C-alpha cells in the first residue's frame, strides 16, 4: 500500500513540475513580445520640424510638422538632451 502511495506521489510530482515550467516559459515569452511591441512604437524625431520649447510652467509646447507620419507631438526629449523636441509616430 505504501509503495502504491509513493508511486502515485512521484507520478504527481512528475506531472506538476513540467506544467509549472511551461507556465513560466509562457510568461517569459509574453514579456519578450510586449517589450518588442512597445519598442516598435517608439517615437521618432526624423522628419519632424517645428517650434517646440519649454514654457515657464515646465511643460513643452509648440507646433510640430511631421511629413509622412500620422501622429506628431511636442514633448520632452528624454534620451537626447534636456529640453523639448518634436516627435513623430505612425
Swiss-Prot record:
Modified residues annotated as Glutamine amide in this record: 89
Q: Please give the superkingdom of this protein's source.
A: Eukaryota
Predominant place of localization: secreted
UniProt tissue specificity: Expressed by the venom duct.
Annotated protein name in UniProt: Conotoxin Ca8.2
Residue span of the signal peptide, if any? 1-21
Native organism: Conus caracteristicus
Family note: Belongs to the conotoxin S superfamily.
According to its record, what are the GO cellular component terms? extracellular region
What would be an example GO MF term here?
toxin activity
Amino acid at each position: 500500500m505504501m509503495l502504491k502511495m509513493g508511486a502515485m506521489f512521484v507520478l504527481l510530482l512528475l506531472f506538476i513540475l513540467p506544467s509549472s515550467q511551461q507556465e513560466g516559459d509562457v510568461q517569459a515569452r509574453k514579456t519578450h513580445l510586449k517589450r518588442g511591441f512597445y519598442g516598435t512604437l517608439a517615437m521618432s524625431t526624423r522628419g519632424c520640424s517645428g517650434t517646440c520649447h519649454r514654457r515657464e510652467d515646465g511643460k513643452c509646447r509648440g507646433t510640430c510638422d511631421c511629413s509622412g507620419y500620422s501622429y506628431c507631438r511636442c514633448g520632452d526629449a528624454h534620451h537626447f538632451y534636456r529640453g523639448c523636441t518634436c516627435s513623430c509616430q505612425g
